[in-house]
Amino acid sequence: MLRRRVSAELPVFPWDTLSDVTAKARAHAGGIVDLSVGTPVDPVAPLIREALAAASAEPGYPTTAGTAALRRSAISALERRYGITGVGEQAVLPVIGTKELIAWLPTLLGLGPDDLVVVPELAYPTYDVGARLAGAQVVVADSLTQVGPRTPALVFINSPSNPTGKVLGVDHLRKVVGWARERGAVIASDECYLGLSWDASPLSVLHPSVSGGDHTGLLAVHSLSKTS
């Protein structure tokens, strides 16, 4: 049986290609402002440190879905911070990291060589990596017209964008949702930076003004490390 050599199909991560220029920038007298990886650099809030310390004597593995209290807390935060309503406890799933979720999502959806995954032109590289790991086809597009007559199985969107900061307006989001639903495609909205905005007010794909109160086929991805 022929085996697919996955490593040969994966792109070179941009951080690897930036190593030389990063070293040069660090040697500069003014130092470097490194925006290449979204690693938290601020001090951990005392409240979080205290909560972790208090839970340090509770060994054991949690359930995959997390505790009911955790899911209720997430639902409350989504409504309080972003105006997202209508999310039930069964619609919330804590994961070990959003990067891992994004990388595995095409595989978890059962996608393969006959399936199409749409990713933004300038975007987090793991969208592309996840599609390739599943053996799916990748289309790089920032507009629906670029996809053409083809029918995707999964569409990644990212607002506010990493790395450009671009925010997709409500009309644009509604159009993408309608377009995807007409084709039976799942939308995975990477909303890790939803709470970080300046001039524009970003909206979740789950917001009533975007989804119409129907979350069918919509997946919003949030990141604890970007909001804590």
What label would you give each PLM region?
Residues 191:
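Walker B catalytic acidic pair
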Residues 10, 44, 164-168, 197, ...:
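Secondary-structure boundary/capping motif
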